[in-house]
Amino acid sequence: MRGHIVVFARAPALGTGKRRLARDIGDLAALRFERQMLARLLRRLGRDRRWHLRLTVTPDHARHRKHLWPRAIQICGQGRGDLGQRMRRALAACPPGPALLIGTDIPALGPGHIAEAFRLLGRYDVVFGPAVDGGFWLVGARRSSCLPPLFGKVRWSGPHALADVLANLPPHVSVGFAPRLEDVDDGGSFHRLATHRGF
């Protein structure tokens, strides 16, 4: 059974996304980075036949802006609610079986990381990709149709996000961890990773 990947993204538009990064490097540079990272991620993961890729975007109406997205990828809106509600809904909308949800701001992310996360779901109920800043770059569930409680009372965009999500899990839920990666949220991480990743 092929796994499913939900790419969780904001439609690239000047002044709307990556606000902390834009404060440090400017709106135009942040927009350029956002577009480049999304295109790179979809190119890296979208052609791999080991999984099915779905792009879930906000705002919802952006899914109709065909010039923004590759033609061969399924696109849907994130819908209403806070970040946790939208993430849970996106995972639950996947067909039965293993499903992963990822963001678009992890320059190192490649097919090997995704394959490893799906392997972990062969042994664990849920899997997380910890981020250097205390958040997470990936969350996945062995059975998308039967998600445990994950996203209630989470302090998003801070050093406690992953710890808060883990604290929500019932004791019987087994947890695996993918490698720790760094996401780009501000000028410091942008300049640190740009040296190695060429964006």
Model-assigned labels for residue ranges:
Residues 1-21:
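N-terminal nucleotide-binding beta1-loop-alpha1 segment
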Residues 32-51:
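A short, N-terminal amphipathic alpha-helix
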Residues 51-59:
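Short beta-strand/loop segment that forms part of the nucleotide-sugar
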Residues 65-98, 158:
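Short phosphate-binding loop-to-helix
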Residues 100-102:
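Short aromatic-hydrophobic micro-motifs that form the base-stacking/packing surface
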Residues 109-135:
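Conserved donor-nucleotide/metal-binding helix-loop-beta segment in metal-dependent transferases, i.e.
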Residues 145-166:
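Short, glycine-/small-residue-rich phosphate/pyrophosphate-handling segment
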Residues 163-199:
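Conserved alpha/beta core of the MobA/IspD/sugar-nucleotide pyrophosphorylase nucleotidyltransferase superfamily
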